[in-house]
Amino acid sequence: MSDQIYDSVHADLDPFKKILNVIPGFKGYVERQARRDSDKLLREMVSSRFEEQWQRISALQRDLISQGDIALIDDLEGPAIKIRTFADRIRRATRGYSSLFEAVKINEAELTQLYQYDAKLLDLAGEVARAVDNVETSIGSDGLQAAIRNLRSVAQQCIEVFDRREEIFTSAPQTPA
């Protein structure tokens, strides 16, 4: 998925930029800019998927209020805040993650690792959706508290994976959990 976004951004270069690619040093600049643009597109897509889940949790909270289950609102608020904060962090992160593509020379192994984290973030969006589905189907049953704990755990895992992704270029090699 990340490669497709990067290729799309890179293919959209106007003729002027294609000509400037032959100027020494400029090609690297264009490459870094294309990586920043693809990074931003990917982050917006991931963020919107998590915002959808946050909206679903908010709707569940409203349903619980209308049913008079006010005590459960606080239980869902923790995971809702984590997911909303996570979506905001992704969307509002500096392009290229704080000049990630400028300050550090990216080698192929690091780039591969970065894309593995991107794939994991997309997988986690699916895990959050399944956890929200589980909460929704558990309303009114004895399994609701367990479903909420699972949602809280998955929300925390999202934050941890994102934190590890940002550390790719500042620490020893890791793999997404």
What are these regions (language model features)?
Residues 1-61, 65:
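Leu/Val/Ala/Ile-rich N-terminal alpha-helices, chiefly Sec-type signal peptides and the beginnings
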Residues 2, 51, 81, 149, ...:
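A broad, low-amplitude sensor of folded, mature protein cores
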Residues 27-44, 80-82, 111, 118, ...:
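Residue-level signal for functionally critical sites in structured catalytic/ligand-binding pockets
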